[in-house]
Design a protein with these regions (language model features):
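Short, surface-exposed loop or secondary-structure junction motifs
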Residues: 91-294
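Short, gly/Ser/Thr-rich active-site loops of penicillin-recognizing serine hydrolases
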Residues: 247, 260-264, 268, 283, ...
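Short, conserved catalytic-motif segment at the N-terminal edge
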Residues: 2-51, 73, 330-340
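Short active-site loop at a secondary-structure junction
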Residues: 13-22, 42-98, 128-140, 226-229
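Short, P/G- and charge-enriched loop/turn segments at secondary-structure junctions
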Residues: 9-13, 50, 220, 293-299, ...
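Short, surface-exposed beta-strand/loop micro-motifs that present aromatic residues
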Residues: 298-299, 305-318
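Structural recognition of the beta-strand scaffold that forms the well-ordered cores
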Residues: 22, 97-99, 309-310, 318-321
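Short beta-strand segments enriched in hydrophobic/aromatic residues
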Residues: 149, 245, 313, 322-325
Length: 374
């Protein structure tokens, strides 16, 4: 484990950009967990530290859809119009194409520029788009899918999460609506910065507020759970869910494998291969979110806040890496400028920059995966 701790130290401040890092990996029974750093105000990270899962929420979305398939509530080959008239401009798009990112969607007004949930819902229901033979990674399909769940089942996405995951597995730190008043358990993502067109912006990230701006508006500040982001959880709870998913307790292994297969094994974008609302192994060794040695039925979900979750269904193993790569960091740079050793120089001052964090994280991911299959 010494090598893993060394690699974690390379990712965390002062060597790297992360303020804290939690790592857990294993199979159905045994697991190994390591922690490093603080979540804010000097509080050390531990197994119940709560992270903003960001886009990892999409994998929960895909699992809920597979559960609805198992319960004969939905057929993924059906178009949207089979279940609702709300999304009139994309009524003929099939659910499976939304899940596999085989759509190109756009609203007239940005969702994060809407002034209320009501306005955002109007924009989302008026969304325009069409089928795309090549998958295009985007939040928009997940936003539509998240709202569609109610039309299909009569139950909101957030209620599905509570009933399918939180309640049955007694998850104390998997939350979307009732975030604890004791903020000392929740990661602080404050002082995040974006460098856009030569202007340095300081992002407003209140503790316990979802980082994704679309989810903030559409979810009405955690009153509703959106399909693209909004879940918070800990490494302890994700470890429980990893084991439950791999042993077929939440959905069958066949259904989990269907998430990996997605829209077909040839369904590849410009730089990635996709399952249903997740990544799978790709031929591009630099861009792939799944280790090259992983099985065909391995899926990964990644969150902008610094999160990574791998499930290898065939090899019966998982990797969870929960990091905070936003606090006190420049997280977006456009246009690109020189980044040396996770630092950028702007206006005569040096800043931590997490733009290349994923490539550094992948070295840790691959090392752990090699240990798992030894």
């Amino acid at each position: 484990m010494n090598r893993i701790r060394e690699m974690m130290r390379d990712l965390c401040k002062p060597n790297g950009v992360c303020s804290c890092l939690s790592v857990c990996f294993g199979g159905n029974e045994e697991s190994v967990c390591e922690y490093l750093g603080t979540i804010g105000d000097g509080i050390p990270v531990d197994s119940e530290t709560i992270f903003d899962l960001a886009s990892v929420t999409k994998l929960f979305l895909a699992i809920v859809y597979q559960k609805m398939v198992e319960e004969n509530l939905v057929c993924l080959d059906e178009p949207i119009e089979r279940y609702t008239i709300r999304f009139h401009n994309i009524a003929n798009i099939k659910l499976k194409h939304l899940l596999s990112f085989n759509v190109q969607l756009q609203t007239d007004k940005r969702i994060d520029e809407c002034n209320s949930r009501d306005e955002a819902i109007i924009e989302l229901c008026d969304i325009k788009g069409s089928y795309s033979e090549k998958p295009i990674y985007s939040d928009m399909a997940a936003l539509v899918l998240g709202e569609l769940i109610y039309d299909i089942s009569g139950k909101n996405f957030g209620d599905w999460v509570d009933d399918l995951f939180v309640g049955p597995y007694n998850l104390k730190t998997t939350l979307w609506r009732k975030l604890p008043k004791d903020y000392s358990r929740i990661c602080s993502y404050d002082n995040e910065k974006w460098l856009i067109n030569g202007v340095l912006y300081n992002k407003n990230n209140p503790v316990a507020e979802v980082n994704d701006p679309k989810s903030r508006v559409l979810g009405n500040h955690s009153e509703f759970l959106c399909g693209n982001a909004g879940l918070f959880s800990s490494i302890n709870d994700l470890e429980v869910l990893s084991k439950a998913l791999l042993n077929g307790s939440i959905i069958s292994k066949k259904s989990l494998m269907a998430i990996a297969e997605g829209g077909g094994w040839e369904n590849r974008g410009d730089q990635q291969s996709f399952g249903f609302q997740c990544y799978r192994k790709d031929v591009n060794p630099i861009q792939t979110e799944v280790p090259s040695k992983a099985s065909k039925y391995a899926i990964a979900s990644v969150g902008f806040t610094g999160l990574y979750w791998l499930l290898d269904i065939e090899n019966n193993c998982y990797i969870i890496i929960l990091a905070n790569k936003l606090k006190d960091c420049v997280s977006k740079v456009y246009p690109n400028i020189a980044i040396e050793e996770s630092r950028i120089l702007f206006d005569g001052k040096q800043y931590d920059c997490s733009v290349n964090y994923v490539y550094q994280r992948d070295r840790l991911r691959d090392y752990i995966y090699d240990l798992l299959i030894m």
